[in-house]
Amino acid sequence: MKIVLANPRGFCAGVDRAISIVERALELYKAPIYVRHEVVHNRFVVEGLKQRGAIFVEELSEVPDDNIVIFSAHGVSQAVRTEAKERALTVFDATCPLVTKVHMEVARASKKSIEVVLIGHAGHPEVEGTMGQYASEAGGMYLVETPEDVEKLIVQDPNNLHYVSQTTLSVDETADVIDELRRVFPKIQGPRKDDICYATQNRQDAVRDMAGQVDVMIVVGSKNSSNSNRLRELSEKLGTTSYLIDCPEELKEEWLTNQAKVGVTAGASAPEELVNQIIEQVKVFGGTTVDELKGREENMFFEVPKELQIKTVS
């Protein structure tokens, strides 16, 4: 049984930056370091940071006074930022710069009282943070997930409307929703460039290229990872039986029985170390050669905050 590796896969620049922020904060300021929400949606990563002294909380009320808190890669609402400022907490912001770009689009629309439609999944922390950028009482912000949601959407002024999207969605599904928005609201405006992040796009393109070449697809990622779920869904949509797993122990031998080729890819928050562990488990179940496909080269890099670039605390 041949193992085919997707390329690109795994960590993106935003995830790399977020994890580095937590690691450097622990190195410079020592444990405990509080992190609001999982810094990235990967159990392997989160457990590793916990062992080094990171404490993950869901609300700032769980952070004691005079402590450091890190905002996760998914971003936070303006209300959370205000609360942290009022409590004089030391904040390091690990929000992905591509999420921040969407936040800025919403904030600009809010200042002009332009209504905003967000394409995204209800309850996802990125969606909650993005919705929390809108402050205009004269306008409004609305969440849609499907073309059917658009059909039911009622806005105040169809001629003064803007849309943005969650960065980790399926490219195809988002395109369907945008098409419906433009049909129902012909004058709606959108971002100059698609909000779907480069890494989400590239990993989905890699799955498209690989799905027809393999008999079964293993996606490495956590169940709460939006972009990992979209990879599994896309592969299934393309006709390849696919599974999302968080660790080698979740891989089942029967999935691979009588299969000639197994594809392996990873969501943007899954580390290569975990991918390698799962490849080794595939080999235990009969995997032989590993063939890595060619893919789009990624050179994106995001700096950590200046305060964390120094080697010692003055």
UniProtKB/Swiss-Prot annotation:
It is an enzyme of class 1 (oxidoreductase). It catalyses: isopentenyl diphosphate + 2 oxidized [2Fe-2S]-[ferredoxin] + H2O = (2E)-4-hydroxy-3-methylbut-2-enyl diphosphate + 2 reduced [2Fe-2S]-[ferredoxin] + 2 H(+); dimethylallyl diphosphate + 2 oxidized [2Fe-2S]-[ferredoxin] + H2O = (2E)-4-hydroxy-3-methylbut-2-enyl diphosphate + 2 reduced [2Fe-2S]-[ferredoxin] + 2 H(+). Its EC number is 1.17.7.4. PANTHER family: 4-HYDROXY-3-METHYLBUT-2-ENYL DIPHOSPHATE REDUCTASE. Catalyzes the conversion of 1-hydroxy-2-methyl-2-(E)-butenyl 4-diphosphate (HMBPP) into a mixture of isopentenyl diphosphate (IPP) and dimethylallyl diphosphate (DMAPP). Acts in the terminal step of the DOXP/MEP pathway for isoprenoid precursor biosynthesis. NCBIfam families: ispH_lytB (TIGR00216), PRK01045.1-2 (NF002188), PRK01045.1-4 (NF002190). This is 4-hydroxy-3-methylbut-2-enyl diphosphate reductase. The lineage of its organism: Bacteria, Pseudomonadati, Pseudomonadota, Gammaproteobacteria, Vibrionales.
